[in-house]
Structures are given as C-alpha cells and as structure tokens.
C-alpha cells in the first residue's frame, strides 16, 4: 500500500530544491547544483507528477517546460491601468520636466532606471503563487498569457513571502538568445525576426507554451501596482522586489539635483554599450512615492515620471537605384544605392536589402526618400520610407527573373525567401567563391584583393581555389601583367604557399559550403578532425552534434555528393592543403584551464584575440563573452574595460598577460 503522505512530502521537497536551484542559476548566476544533479531531480519530479497528478503543486518548476496549447488568448481588464510614459528627447526637455516638479515640491529625489526595450507585462500573485500574467494591451485591457509566462525561467512561480500582489515588468530577449533564435530560424528556412523586441513580442503571443519555453525570454520587474504594498521610495521598492525573488535591473541611481541627474545620464551612455540586451532610454521618476499623487497624471501618462530616449543617429537620403547581386552560393541579394550621406561618422552610399520579401515589406522604391541608420551601430539599414514625400514617380520594385551575371532563369524553393542562380558556371559566383576562399577568416591570403582575383580570373589563370596553388607554374604570365612586379609576385606566391598550413576549420570554411559559417566550421572540425570523417558522416550522425541541425547536415551531404566538389577537394589535398585538424578533439593533457570558463578583455601584446582564443581552447578552456559568477578566470590585457572592475567585485581570479605567458610555456600542450 502506498504512503501518499510520503509521496506528497517528496514532491514538495523536490519542488523546493529545484525552485532554489532555478533562482541560484537564473537570478544570481551562481548555480549550486551541477547540470546532471538538476536533470536527475527534475526527471524524478516529472515521474512523480505523472504518476500522482493530484499532488502536483501550482508552482511546480515543471511548468517551465511548457507544452500547454491555447486556442486563443482571452482579454482581461487590468486592476490598475498600465499607463505609458511621456518622452523627452534632449536636455532642455529634461530640465523642463525637472522644473515642473520643483514648482510643486521643492525637496525631492529622482530615481533613474534603464528603459528596457521589450514587452510590458503585469504579474498577479495570490498567497505568493503566480496566478495570472497579462500583456499591456491598450493599457486598460490585456491578453492573458499566464501559461506562457510560467515557462519564463526568471519569473518566479512562487515568491519568498505568501503575499497577494501585482507587479509590473518588461519581458525581453537578450542578444545571445536572439542570435541563437534567428540562427535556428535561418537553418529552418523561416523568416528572421528583425530585432529582439519583435522576437519577444511574437514569442509571448505563441499559442503553444512549449515554444515559449525554448526561446529563453527574460524579465526585469520594476514596480508594484498595489499601493498598500509599496515602500516609501522607488529605490526601496526595487530592493523589496529583489528580496521576494524577482529579477530587477541593477542599473539604477538615486540623485538629489539636476546636476547629478546630468552626470548619471552620461554614465548610462557607457553602460548602454556593455549591455547584452536592448534598451532605448532612461526612465526618470520621483523616488518618493508619496509625491506621485501630488504631481498627478494626464489621461495617458504620469507627470511624476518620463522616459529620456537615447538618440538614434539617423540621416535622410534618396534611393538612387536598387540592383541585384549574385553571391558565391548563387543567392540573389538586392542592394540599395542611395545618395551618399554621413551616418554615425561614416559615409554610406549603399544598403543591403537582404531579399525581395524585405523590399516588399518596407515598400522601398527607387527615388523614395528614406531614413538610414546603423543597425547595432555597425550595419547601414533603411529604418523607414518617408511616404509623405512619395509622388507618382516612385513605382513598386519588381523582382528580376534572370541572374544579373549570367542571365540564367532564377529559381526559388517553396517556403524559402531567397532566389537562386543554379548555374555552376556563373562567372560572378566563381569570382565570389575565390574571394571568399582567400578572405581573412578563411585561408587569409590577404595579398589577393578583389581586383587581383578578377584580373587573374579574366586571364584564365584561376577559376577555382585549387588553381591558386598552381599559379607558380604561370609566373611568366604574371610578370607580363601590368602592375605585377617581381616583389609583388613573390609576396603573392609566398602567401599562397603559407596558406597550406591553415587548420581544418579554416579550410572547411573556405570551401564555401552552404550554411557553413565560421562557427559551424569550428564545431565540425573539432568533432570530425578530418575531411574524410566528415565526408563519410550521414546527416543522422552530423545532427547528433548539439549545434548542428538537419539543414546544415543536408547541405554537407549535398556538397560531398557532387563529383566536381569531390574532385576539387582531392586536388587541394594533392597540392598540400591540410584537411586535418591541428587541435586534438579531447586533449589528454590536463591544464589549469581544462573545462574552465574564461573571459578575455583588453588587448594582449603577444597574441591577437583569435590566436589566444585558439590556444586557450587547445588547453581545454571554454571561452565566453559575458562575465558572471559562473566564470573561473578573467584574462586581461592593456586597456581592459569594465569587465575588470566587475571581476574584482565578483572576486573572479584575474590573470595578466605575463602570468598567462608563463602558464602557456609551462603547459605540455604543443602550440
């Protein structure tokens, strides 16, 4: 006979352990259980809840797994309206906001918080248990997304106190999670999300909560909507929320005058560049909550708070032409030629438009007036079309039917957004493949620029990568070409010869296999070690690698099923190009860095960032970009940034270059 009391107690115990582990991992970045221990406990809890569903707790961590499918979202009225904030865009407007408060309240303080670029949400708890989650909606009515919210790992299902309260927060998608999601969607041939906010919004509205669980959404909670539970100040409220188990944003400051406020705003400009999530401004609010009612609100927004929006550096230009280019894989990419304009410190004259669907979505036309900015402060992008300036002269952009280089009819696979030229003899594709082969992240033959490649191609000296390694046989032809002196020819031939020593991961990337980027080539080279192993691998075997999906596996199979590709690989091997990994997959020599998580910051004098990363990985290290308590070491060079300060606060061991060099020299790893 089963003892149900013991079963109930066991379930409660497992829930308590797993809830604590989740909080340690996702909120404090300080796990107290290994992955194996956590998985074992979770599996045990799932088994017990499956056998005894009557004992499943409403705040069980198994809810984080998802799997509930809604038919549609119901609409529920907010207990307290979710008001939007007014905006200010410059220091004069901030001063006006400040002065309006001073007229009514001579003595007060302000609290500044980051304005997270995400999706506003309201969370309702009864006796400390999450019972409802609503989107902002129109501020009065919101959609019930409770099942989805339960899967978000940084939303506590049970608070540390049994309170009835409603909190407000912002759901967001971090940059790493966004990049991973889009990489997966690209692999699955699905439309990419344009930015993390859109991805977060689209994810929250998924009817299947299992999809939400997979996308690693996060939350920052910033306020309590129940007046009787709030603390005297906003600062104390944030501390209280953190104590209850919520994740609050750490970047808040309390200031007592306008001069201090300006200093803090300057500080945020530095902070913003180091964040792993999007923020579009600063929220400035009166810190003392009792003063909020004195200042009041308009019908749309409170007067006691405002949002200072970070300036987006944009410029206006005119679309002069839209051309279509063919790449090394045959993909057709539209490029927008615009009237040259300065954007964020550099002259921009063209903008890549990704694909024809992108053109249609933004309705970009020749002679349109457009607003241009730099996405991620790097890549020029058309932010929007100024349709108020459009006339009858602007006609919809039509997709071309033939390859712009070889006039082959273009093809588009069902469900794909890209058009392709499938002609293997397309001149432009061949040139682009050669340019890719010699590029920095591939074979790194930097003396061969684009114009040199084209000149050699037009002279029938090269048509495929293996021809580069036969150029020395045509030295007499090179000597007759204008601009190619003896020294230049020697430099070219020496650089080509030196490239034979490049590692397997570089050569694999240089081959230009569809969907095989630099990171994927590193993963494949590390796993398979040789080109022969990769050739013989089935898609089923390849997809057993965690980072590799079926689309990449099929692309590899298709590449090695082509006799021309096999012949080219064979020629390259015969000519001395290495197709074997220089780094052993599992180094037997243990080092101080074996299985240790390491972050790099600053500039090393002896090594480039790529070189030291490869050395550390060969010594068994795991290189990460962001710094947290999970990291074992921080390696610092000159001009180290804020990561050094953070590591000191977190008491993470710091290794300087001199000490690092001694560790490398004392290791038994062959470099």
Swiss-Prot record:
<comment type="function">
    <text>DNA ligase that catalyzes the formation of phosphodiester linkages between 5'-phosphoryl and 3'-hydroxyl groups in double-stranded DNA using NAD as a coenzyme and as the energy source for the reaction. It is essential for DNA replication and repair of damaged DNA.</text>
</comment>
<keyword id="KW-0479">Metal-binding</keyword>
<dbReference type="Pfam" id="PF03120">
    <property type="entry name" value="DNA_ligase_OB"/>
</dbReference>
<dbReference type="InterPro" id="IPR012340">
    <property type="entry name" value="NA-bd_OB-fold"/>
</dbReference>
<dbReference type="InterPro" id="IPR010994">
    <property type="entry name" value="RuvA_2-like"/>
</dbReference>
<dbReference type="GO" id="GO:0006260">
    <property type="term" value="P:DNA replication"/>
</dbReference>
<dbReference type="InterPro" id="IPR001357">
    <property type="entry name" value="BRCT_dom"/>
</dbReference>
<comment type="similarity">
    <text>Belongs to the NAD-dependent DNA ligase family. LigA subfamily.</text>
</comment>
<dbReference type="InterPro" id="IPR001679">
    <property type="entry name" value="DNA_ligase"/>
</dbReference>
<dbReference type="GO" id="GO:0046872">
    <property type="term" value="F:metal ion binding"/>
</dbReference>
<dbReference type="GO" id="GO:0003911">
    <property type="term" value="F:DNA ligase (NAD+) activity"/>
</dbReference>
<dbReference type="Pfam" id="PF00533">
    <property type="entry name" value="BRCT"/>
</dbReference>
<feature type="binding site">
    <location>
        <position position="170"/>
    </location>
    <ligand>
        <name>NAD(+)</name>
    </ligand>
</feature>
<dbReference type="InterPro" id="IPR013839">
    <property type="entry name" value="DNAligase_adenylation"/>
</dbReference>
<keyword id="KW-0235">DNA replication</keyword>
<dbReference type="Pfam" id="PF01653">
    <property type="entry name" value="DNA_ligase_aden"/>
</dbReference>
<keyword id="KW-0460">Magnesium</keyword>
<dbReference type="GO" id="GO:0003677">
    <property type="term" value="F:DNA binding"/>
</dbReference>
<dbReference type="InterPro" id="IPR036420">
    <property type="entry name" value="BRCT_dom_sf"/>
</dbReference>
<dbReference type="InterPro" id="IPR018239">
    <property type="entry name" value="DNA_ligase_AS"/>
</dbReference>
<dbReference type="InterPro" id="IPR013840">
    <property type="entry name" value="DNAligase_N"/>
</dbReference>
<dbReference type="InterPro" id="IPR003583">
    <property type="entry name" value="Hlx-hairpin-Hlx_DNA-bd_motif"/>
</dbReference>
<dbReference type="GO" id="GO:0006281">
    <property type="term" value="P:DNA repair"/>
</dbReference>
<feature type="binding site">
    <location>
        <position position="406"/>
    </location>
    <ligand>
        <name>Zn(2+)</name>
    </ligand>
</feature>
<feature type="binding site">
    <location>
        <position position="421"/>
    </location>
    <ligand>
        <name>Zn(2+)</name>
    </ligand>
</feature>
<keyword id="KW-0520">NAD</keyword>
<keyword id="KW-0436">Ligase</keyword>
<feature type="binding site">
    <location>
        <begin position="84"/>
        <end position="85"/>
    </location>
    <ligand>
        <name>NAD(+)</name>
    </ligand>
</feature>
<feature type="active site" description="N6-AMP-lysine intermediate">
    <location>
        <position position="115"/>
    </location>
</feature>
<feature type="binding site">
    <location>
        <begin position="35"/>
        <end position="39"/>
    </location>
    <ligand>
        <name>NAD(+)</name>
    </ligand>
</feature>
<feature type="binding site">
    <location>
        <position position="136"/>
    </location>
    <ligand>
        <name>NAD(+)</name>
    </ligand>
</feature>
<keyword id="KW-0227">DNA damage</keyword>
<dbReference type="Pfam" id="PF03119">
    <property type="entry name" value="DNA_ligase_ZBD"/>
</dbReference>
<dbReference type="InterPro" id="IPR041663">
    <property type="entry name" value="DisA/LigA_HHH"/>
</dbReference>
<dbReference type="InterPro" id="IPR004150">
    <property type="entry name" value="NAD_DNA_ligase_OB"/>
</dbReference>
<keyword id="KW-0234">DNA repair</keyword>
<dbReference type="Pfam" id="PF22745">
    <property type="entry name" value="Nlig-Ia"/>
</dbReference>
<protein>
    <recommendedName>
        <fullName>DNA ligase</fullName>
        <ecNumber>6.5.1.2</ecNumber>
    </recommendedName>
</protein>
<keyword id="KW-0862">Zinc</keyword>
<dbReference type="GO" id="GO:0005829">
    <property type="term" value="C:cytosol"/>
</dbReference>
<feature type="binding site">
    <location>
        <position position="309"/>
    </location>
    <ligand>
        <name>NAD(+)</name>
    </ligand>
</feature>
<feature type="binding site">
    <location>
        <position position="426"/>
    </location>
    <ligand>
        <name>Zn(2+)</name>
    </ligand>
</feature>
